[in-house]
Amino acid sequence: MPQSSAATARAQTRTEAAYSRWAPFYDLIFDLPFHPGRLAASRAAAAAAGKDGAMLVVGVGTGLELELLPADLRVTGVDISAAMLDVARERVARKGLRQVKSLQVMDAGAMDFADGQFDVALAPYVMSVVPNPARVLSETWRVIRPGGRMVVMNHFAAAGGPRAAIEAAMEKAAWWLGWHPKFPYAAVGDWIAAQPDAELIERRKLPPLRLFTLLVIGKRAQS
């Protein structure tokens, strides 16, 4: 295995371990602080999908987004953590979320879906988690149909000031946290700029404290 692939595999193993630790109490800690962004991203993705649209949720985790999505969608969720998906499945069963058609353990960087299978993809708080964001972006892009959209909700590191110093200090514990506090916007922005069929439709900061950013990226229809 090449060095880069080996490093990615090790990082992914650490991520799986981190979210196995988080799974039992993830919702208790991350539900309310992340809810405004989660709600905005879910609404943007649902609007893009339309009635009976096929939606992929990348990094679905414990499924906090699922109950925010309309019942007339056809939702598939993937996550690398089986422990997180166990919580999501229990949520779907308990709340009768009929829009959820499938929840699968899957590497977001190598998904078992056909090209253009989905109308829209929602990637909530996942790009600063995965070992190779560009690979996940490209793979998510592949499974969106031309004319579809990708909705990304994420934290991006501050350029300077006290918040940047805090993020730099927290980055030392990224292996334990399961995400990278010092995650630059360029990791996503440069990828968007490099795609000839991509258009950044919306970029909007959201509460709390404008810590999170919503991106809506359109995939141009083939001429």
PLM feature spans:
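Conserved class I S-adenosyl-L-methionine
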Residues: 2-50, 64-65, 87, 91-95, ...
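C-terminal alpha-helical "lid/dimerization" subdomain adjacent to the S-adenosyl-L-methionine
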Residues: 13, 153-208
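Class I SAM-dependent methyltransferase SAM/SAH-binding core
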Residues: 54-110
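A short acidic, Gly/Pro-enriched loop at the edge of an enzyme's catalytic core
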Residues: 109-121
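A short SAM/SAH-binding and catalytic strip from SAM-dependent methyltransferases
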Residues: 119-132
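C-terminal lobe and adjacent flexible extensions of AdoMet/dcAdoMet transferase-like proteins
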Residues: 215-223
